Amino acid sequence: MKKVLAIILGGGAGTRLYPLTKLRAKPAVPVAGKYRLIDIPVSNCINSEIFKIYVLTQFNSASLNRHIARTYNFSGFSEGFVEVLAAQQTPENPNWFQGTADAVRQYLWMLQEWDVDEFLILSGDHLYRMDYRLFIQRHRETNADITLSVIPIDDRRASDFGLMKIDNSGRVIDFSEKPKGEALTKMRVDTTVLGLTPEQAASQPYIASMGIYVFKKDVLIKLLKEALERTDFGKEIIPDAAKDHNVQAYLFDDYWEDIGTIEAFYNANLALTQQPMPPFSFYDEEAPIYTRARYLPPTKLLDCHVTESIIGEGCILKNCRIQHSVLGVRSRIETGCMIEESLLMGADFYQASVERQCSIDKGDIPVGIGPDTIIRRAIIDKNARIGHDVKIINKDNVQEADRESQGFYIRSGIVVVLKNAVITDGTII
């Protein structure tokens, strides 16, 4: 894999994940209590022996830069690196990234200098575990110009993805990005060609692109240079290339989830607590997911009742009830709290005992969840200060609401408390 360069697309403004992307780039959003989204594709690369990795980003990249700099330091005796390339304006190109392909095009001058055979294009907001070596091996065996990683998909979600038709050799003969109505119906295929059983094929009659591509180096350079108006891989580059290039499909038959929306992000995190077998597990010694070593003390639970939950390191929980939830590092839950079906991202720092007591004496709210608070079906972002006897339960069953001045949003019925928000004593949401 020394001849492969990975390019992870950091995504746009992250509007579908807002407000989690208010102060951070999408790949820097915390996941599963201690990781960040960027750790997923980077770990997949490392486990696949791909060590040349660029991350392209445009918005709020400070925390992403910090995380990558602290986490992925390869030794000086290898060519390996993980580097963030932020959007920049130049005399030749005064514009920001206009799309996924344009992001790669603007850094082509740097990427084409590498002595590699393939570019591996990845997305920064997917949850999955994949050995890219098998993917690239298939690309080489079929002598493909481009290979797309694909999954079979059902009617309900089909219009959210790029869909394709393939022939018996696996070659892509038609491609349509997020079709609707009649255009969607035209993309139905017999997915038994992918090896599905007739029953599976009946329920999943579409072949969807995962947004993961391998390009021959010279093919990508040619496609990006010859038509500057093509700014997006899914909408323009791939459909046009399918007409006159050997574009192959590679079936990925394991768990994969696009967690680019609040609802999908929430569901994917809580699914990690499922018993006995969650759809995705971080407990895999063969292909671990890496992140920053924080050197935190073990979690302390004092008279707590915890069921079906994941609790990050360095947490302090006192006489509380935690059910079907994920708690991030340094979470602090006080006496009498009840946390149900919620994702708490934890905190970036500890408040010293003296400082906490001073805050309480002054009438301020310390970082963490105050006594006798109930949180149900919510996401609590980092460093939130939630007071005494607060109820975050979406009492009116609101589906969508923007209450930034009050420290929270509601998305798909899920209450999202902002990073650094203060929710005062007795508040009912």
UniProtKB/Swiss-Prot annotation:
InterPro entries per record: ADP-Glc_PPase, ADP_Glu_pyroP_CS, GlgC_bac, NTP_transferase_dom, Nucleotide-diphossugar_trans, Trimer_LpxA-like_sf
Biological processes annotated in GO: glycogen biosynthetic process
Annotated EC: 2.7.7.27
Classification via Gene3D superfamilies: Hexapeptide repeat proteins (2.160.10.10), Spore Coat Polysaccharide Biosynthesis Protein SpsA, Chain A (3.90.550.10)
Superkingdom in the source lineage: Bacteria
Record keywords, A-Z: ATP-binding, Carbohydrate metabolism, Glycogen biosynthesis, Glycogen metabolism, Nucleotide-binding, Nucleotidyltransferase, Transferase
SUPFAM superfamilies: Nucleotide-diphospho-sugar transferases (SSF53448), Trimeric LpxA-like enzymes (SSF51161)
Regulation: Activated by 3-phosphoglycerate and inhibited by phosphate.
Annotated catalysed reactions: alpha-D-glucose 1-phosphate + ATP + H(+) = ADP-alpha-D-glucose + diphosphate
GO CC field: carboxysome
Pathway connected to this protein: Glycan biosynthesis; glycogen biosynthesis
MF term (GO), any: ATP binding
Pfam families the UniProt entry points to: LbH_GLGC (PF25247), NTP_transferase (PF00483)
Top enzyme class: transferase
Family membership: Belongs to the bacterial/plant glucose-1-phosphate adenylyltransferase family.
PANTHER family xrefs: GLUCOSE-1-PHOSPHATE ADENYLYLTRANSFERASE LARGE SUBUNIT 1, CHLOROPLASTIC-RELATED, GLUCOSE-1-PHOSPHATE ADENYLYLTRANSFERASE-RELATED
HAMAP family cross-referenced by the UniProt entry: GlgC
Subunit composition and interactions: Homotetramer.
Purpose: Involved in the biosynthesis of ADP-glucose, a building block required for the elongation reactions to produce glycogen. Catalyzes the reaction between ATP and alpha-D-glucose 1-phosphate (G1P) to produce pyrophosphate and ADP-Glc.
Protein name: Glucose-1-phosphate adenylyltransferase
Gene encoding the protein: glgC
